[in-house]
Amino acid sequence: AEGVLPADGPDRMIEEYREHLDKGELLYNPVLAGYKHPKTIDWTPFLTKGYIENCDTTVPIKELKRLSKRLTTFPEGFVLHSRVKKIAEDRAAMGEGKVPVDWGMAENLAYASLLVSGYGVRISGEDVGRGTFFHRHAAFHDQDRENWAEGTYHPLMNLQEKQSSFYSYDSVLSEEAVLAFEYGYASANPYELVIWEAQFGDFANGAQVVIDQFIASGEAKW
């Protein structure tokens, strides 16, 4: 009715298709079996050990204290929110051994130990910079900043002159898209810890297809 194809168009297409079949001609572009793209990541070295095998992840106390100092040091003139300032002060005391280390500080120290050892860290999710329950604080905001786009400081990006990259992305409420992207990113970066964090437990439901189709069966299926 719209004139997209002439009246005899479909019949002619079928006839031509059958003529090609009768001649034994290939009607599709062949896919090369066993082809390996030059930029394909070789995961073979990482498949020799089981994930339940013991691994020494200890960090010397001297190094933990050094990293703690870096995690609680801010640029001159950087003004913290009063509640966040208290958290930073408590973390400094934790690094000095004056009070027990809490979950948020332990997490930041773990990331820091990876970053100075040559392993990148990348976190994404709706509220990962602060942490949904106010625990992480990987990103700090200057209360005297002139505009929203400026005045953000990430201690994990400033541990030492030579370190691996740290990124934290407060992503939009599109769990499936974000997790799918991060899965692809992680697949191409074996030396980087890539984390997607659902803001609340049921938010993972929006990304369930990616979990089922790619992550749960990743090694066996893909």
Stretches found by the model and what they are:
Residues 1-222:
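Flexible, glycine-rich loop/tail regions that form catalytic "lids" or insertion modules at the edges
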